[in-house]
């Protein structure tokens, strides 16, 4: 179920070697843009920010996933708010965007709970599991987030 809502670049099935490669990749980054979600001293998910380039260099795209046993417990809402606060504080990024596949209603609700607003729907924008699907586009500005957490 997790892979159904992630980009195809996330390996499936996810092996121990995939995990080691990811840790090496994250360790080599100049800017902290990946956050591990830990529950009961176990890795339970990930939050990542992919900074834009050129004229979009003050933007970042948000990606995240959480292991299924932890769904519906408010963990992702809490962890996203914390990671976004940290990322905005330590970078000059002014805007974070997120793309959510049409069927992932829970993920849309999580984003809205922490202040993201839906900007539109890109129709048939993604090809996942052999099917074209709409992608819901969300954004959050640094100044809006600051006003929410005051």
What would you call each of these model-derived segments?
Residues 21-23, 124-125:
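A generic local structural motif
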Residues 1-20, 143-150:
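A short, well-structured alpha-helix characteristic of acyl/acetyltransferase catalytic modules
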């Amino acid at each position: 179920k997790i892979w159904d809502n992630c980009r195809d670049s996330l390996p499936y099935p996810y092996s121990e070697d995939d995990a080691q490669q990811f840790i090496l990749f994250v360790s080599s980054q100049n800017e902290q843009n990946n956050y591990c979600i830990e529950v009961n001293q176990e890795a339970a998910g990930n939050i990542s920010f992919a900074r834009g380039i050129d004229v979009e260099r003050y933007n970042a795209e948000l990606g995240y996933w959480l292991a299924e046993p932890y769904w519906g417990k408010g963990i992702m809402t809490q962890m996203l708010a914390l990671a976004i606060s940290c990322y905005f504080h330590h970078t000059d990024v002014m805007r974070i965007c997120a793309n959510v596949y049409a069927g992932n209603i829970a993920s849309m609700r999580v984003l809205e709970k922490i202040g993201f607003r839906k900007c539109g729907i890109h129709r048939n924008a993604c090809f996942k599991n052999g099917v074209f699907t709409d992608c819901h586009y969300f954004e959050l500005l640094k100044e809006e987030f600051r006003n929410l957490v005051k």
